[in-house]
């Protein structure tokens, strides 16, 4: 790789050439100095990238980026169109960090683009077997091909298809392939808050949510609520039976209200009135008077309540007279 000269060193050389010179330089004032010729050649060489001589690395067996030795799997030495050689893993990481679809890769040294195969990608770049160590130059038996999945950021080894030979040759087991190498997600799939794609996606998602909310609200207001109010269906209450351990007091049975009723008392002469209650004896005259025949009472003169006929007292027929007689006897 060419090493460009610093600009202040160039100014220092030109100033030295323009200063007071020896008498030999006075005789030829128009002749350019040697330093100016070198600067002009370097400026012409820096005009086109990659046109200068390529400086070899400190060790030809190491990558210029990761400074790791090459191997025959993921550290394969791949040469770009500009002539620089890097390992496959570093080129894969560079492709993931580059925006775009991965159709080309730029050289990290001279920025020269290198077109890649449409479906094969980075593993299809030419390999430099001369930079591999001796143990990696020998082809391994039944070794698969290295694949690069840019969408998943995965570098893996694809196993070879089974050989159509006899079964005895298949018994020789090949060494297990190395685990796939995850390199990260591509730059085009990484969403950041500052990227315009993220803002656009957020705006679209918000618009979709607002539209869905308006549609659901309209269906609920204009269809569901009128249907419920117009329908005569009402929620029915169902009486559930209580549990076995739950006791409910029984309801009191309604009782008819008590009404005062007069009962007719038998009027037999052999009835002992001494055993009856005094309250009942007071009501008996009224009942007897009510039971008398109006024809019989027509010929009997009205007497005051204290006077009773003598015949009734002698015959003990009138219970009231009998009670009055007993009172008179007690008073005497």
UniProtKB/Swiss-Prot annotation:
Q: Which PROSITE patterns match?
A: ZF_RING_1 (PS00518), ZF_RING_2 (PS50089)
Q: Where do Low complexity bias regions lie? A: 15-27
Bilayer-crossing residues are: 205-225
UniProt entry tagged with the keyword Metal-binding: yes
User: What is the membrane topology noted in the UniProt record heading this document?
Assistant: Single-pass membrane protein
Which residue intervals make up region (Disordered)? 1-55, 121-187, 259-332
Q: Name one GO molecular function term.
A: zinc ion binding
Chain intervals with Acidic residues compositional bias: 36-46
**Signal peptide extent:** none
Q: Which CDD domains match?
A: RING-HC_RNF183-like (cd16556)
Q: List the disulfide bonds.
A: none
Where are the RING-type-classified zinc fingers?
A: 63-111
**Does the record carry Transmembrane helix as a key word?**
yes
Protein name per the record: RING finger protein 225
- Record organism: Mus musculus
Q: Which gene encodes it?
A: Rnf225
């Amino acid at each position: 790789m060419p090493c460009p000269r610093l600009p202040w060193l160039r100014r220092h050389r030109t100033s030295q050439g323009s200063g007071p010179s020896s008498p030999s330089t006075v005789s030829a004032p128009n002749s350019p100095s040697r330093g100016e010729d070198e600067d002009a050649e370097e400026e012409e060489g820096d005009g086109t990238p990659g046109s200068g001589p390529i400086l070899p690395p400190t060790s030809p067996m190491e990558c210029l980026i990761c400074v790791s030795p090459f191997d025959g799997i993921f550290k394969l030495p791949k040469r770009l169109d500009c002539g620089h050689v890097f390992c496959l893993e570093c080129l894969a990481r560079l492709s993931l960090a580059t925006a775009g679809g991965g159709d080309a890769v730029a050289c990290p040294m001279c920025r020269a683009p290198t077109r890649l195969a449409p479906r094969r990608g980075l593993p299809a770049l030419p390999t430099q077997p001369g930079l591999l160590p001796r143990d990696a130059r020998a082809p391994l038996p039944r070794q698969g091909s290295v694949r690069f999945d840019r969408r998943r950021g995965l570098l893996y080894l694809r196993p070879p298809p089974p050989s159509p030979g006899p079964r005895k040759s298949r018994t020789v087991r090949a060494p297990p392939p190395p685990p796939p190498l995850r390199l990260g997600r591509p730059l085009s799939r990484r969403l950041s808050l500052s990227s315009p794609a993220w803002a656009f996606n957020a705006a679209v998602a918000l618009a979709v949510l607002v539209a869905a909310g308006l549609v659901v609200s309209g269906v609920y207001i204009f269809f569901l609520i009128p249907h419920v109010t117009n329908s005569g269906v009402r929620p029915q209450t169902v009486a559930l039976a209580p549990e076995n351990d739950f006791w409910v007091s029984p309801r009191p049975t309604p009782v008819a209200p008590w009404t005062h009723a007069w009962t007719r008392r038998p009027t037999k002469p052999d009835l002992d009135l001494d055993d009856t209650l005094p309250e009942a004896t007071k009501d008996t005259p009224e009942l007897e008077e009510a039971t008398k025949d109006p024809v019989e009472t027509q010929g009997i003169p009205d007497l005051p309540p204290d006077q009773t006929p003598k015949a009734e007292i002698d015959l003990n027929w009138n219970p009231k007279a009998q009670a009055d007689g007993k009172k008179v006897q007690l008073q005497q």
